[in-house]
């Protein structure tokens, strides 16, 4: 997306009476539902004495650290810093845009759910996709940032849960 497209989208959101409030709510809701559900999954696995909890924690934890290190070295600028506009979500970071850690996390957590329960996994893959779209619309990521985050999340999940 280019400067004109980002400004058009963010201005349209601002035009609606509750546009900004709704966009911020959706961002917070999608983020919190993923993390709260993941925590609930871990608690459930502990209660069930499910030995797969070790794999779930290790795969998600190691891949999260690796993505964090990679994005720090890439240090890609965010759309609002490159195109000089105010994003819908308040952010003050100039870099660390690629890959999107929110989207990566949502997808690797969705893969953890898929590993444990197919239906919940599909549900959280849909939530992760919605989060990816939302992160672009509110102006904090480029499409490539969320696509790469999603791919890394899915690949990490496939390798960690199904190949190794």
Region spans (language model):
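N-terminal transmembrane-helix/juxtamembrane module of multi-pass inner/ER membrane proteins
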Residues: 1-36, 51, 67-95
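Structural signal for the C-terminal ends of transmembrane alpha-helices
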Residues: 18, 43-49, 116, 161-163
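Hydrophobic alpha-helical transmembrane segments
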Residues: 30-42, 123-126
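Interfacial segments of alpha-helical transmembrane regions
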Residues: 40-66
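Transmembrane helix-loop junctions in multipass membrane proteins, especially transporters and channels
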Residues: 47, 75-80, 139-144
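Small-polar-interrupted transmembrane alpha-helices in polytopic inner-membrane proteins
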Residues: 58-71, 122-134
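Transmembrane alpha-helical segments of multi-pass membrane transport proteins and ion-pumping complexes
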Residues: 64-68, 72, 154-161
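Membrane-embedded catalytic cores of phosphoryl/pyrophosphoryl-handling enzymes
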Residues: 84-164
């Amino acid at each position: 997306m280019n400067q004109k497209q980002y400004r058009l989208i963010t201005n349209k959101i601002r035009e609606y009476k509750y546009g900004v409030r709704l966009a911020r709510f959706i961002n917070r809701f999608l983020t919190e539902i993923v993390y709260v559900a993941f925590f609930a999954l871990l608690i459930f696995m502990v209660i069930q004495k499910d030995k797969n909890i070790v794999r779930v924690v290790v795969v998600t934890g190691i891949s999260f650290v690796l993505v964090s290190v990679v994005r720090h070295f890439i240090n890609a600028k965010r759309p609002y810093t490159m195109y000089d506009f105010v994003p819908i979500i308040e952010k003050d970071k100039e870099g660390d845009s690629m890959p999107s850690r929110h989207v990566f996390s949502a997808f690797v957590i969705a893969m953890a759910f898929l590993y444990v329960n197919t239906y919940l996994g599909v549900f959280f893959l849909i939530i992760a996709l919605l989060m990816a779209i939302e992160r672009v619309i509110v102006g904090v990521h480029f499409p490539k940032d969320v696509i790469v985050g999603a791919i890394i999340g899915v690949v990490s999940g496939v390798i960690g849960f199904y190949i190794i």
